[in-house]
Regions:
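Conserved AMP-binding/adenylation subdomain of ANL enzymes
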Residues: 100-117, 124-167, 182
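Conserved pre-ATP/AMP-binding loop-to-beta segment of ANL
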Residues: 42-50, 58-81, 88, 111-117, ...
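Alpha-helix capping/helix-boundary segments
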Residues: 22-24, 174-176, 202
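Short hydrophobic/charged patches on amphipathic alpha-helices used for structural packing
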Residues: 5, 68, 154-158, 186
Length: 218
């Protein structure tokens, strides 16, 4: 709950939208004892006392009308918190041109096009869950594959890539390190054309072994 409390205080949060799971809502309620937030919303599957139901609110919300004066490109669109490797996490603000800047990520780094089906492995606690899955990828016209797993296993991930014919894949080096220990002969990865990595240093041995198994250079 400390992480929630810290971010609420630093950013002046007015609303929290969360997954409706007991642990998450308990942590939020603990933080609210110190830093109350006016509006709490649960997207399900559970609702708790003090939380609005996203679905019920959505069902009765009026149609959106575009404001006469839209946001300016220089207005703040979102704020990330850094990972806090030195001291507490720090806020980093991004304006409305930020998303457009990731056109280069989707088109030139992930190498995506309108026929692409892209999968990025990144938890929603990381900025990459946004810039690695949404902005540049959709600007490129690609479809984004969402794999909601409770526990990561390299075998299950490879099964998804094989079954759904993923064409582009991005994950941290640690994921590739686990993947190369699987039996690649069990999976049809012929749809996979381009793979990228980010987040930490890539061990040369992992790079070479993945290229041997797939013919793809990270």
């Amino acid at each position: 709950s400390h992480d929630i409390q810290y971010r609420v205080e630093r950013a002046g949060i007015k609303c929290i939208v969360c997954v409706g799971e007991d642990y998450v809502m308990e942590q939020i309620n603990d933080a609210m004892q110190h830093t109350p937030v006016p509006v709490l919303v649960s997207i399900g599957p559970k609702d708790a006392e003090g939380f609005h139901s996203w679905q019920r609110e959505w069902d009765c919300v009026p149609a959106f009308e575009r404001p006469f004066t839209p946001n300016d490109n220089s207005d703040t669109m979102l704020m990330y918190f850094t990972s806090g490797t030195s001291g507490e996490p720090k806020m980093v603000a991004h304006d409305f041109l930020y998303a457009l800047g990731h056109l280069t990520t989707g088109v030139f780094w992930h190498n995506l096009g309108e026929d692409s089906l892209h999968l990025t492995v990144a938890d929603t606690g990381w900025g990459k869950a946004v810039w690695g899955k949404m902005y540049g990828q959709w600007f490129a016209g690609a479809a984004v594959f969402v794999y909601d797993h409770e526990k990561f296993t390299a075998k299950a991930l490879l099964e998804q890539i094989s079954k759904y014919r993923i064409t582009s894949f991005c994950a941290p080096p640690t994921v590739y390190r686990f993947m190369i220990h699987e039996d690649f002969s069990q999976f049809d990865l012929s749809s996979l054309h381009y793979c990228t990595t980010a987040g930490e240093a890539l061990n040369p041995a992992v790079y070479e072994r993945f290229r041997e198994l797939t013919g793809i250079s990270l």
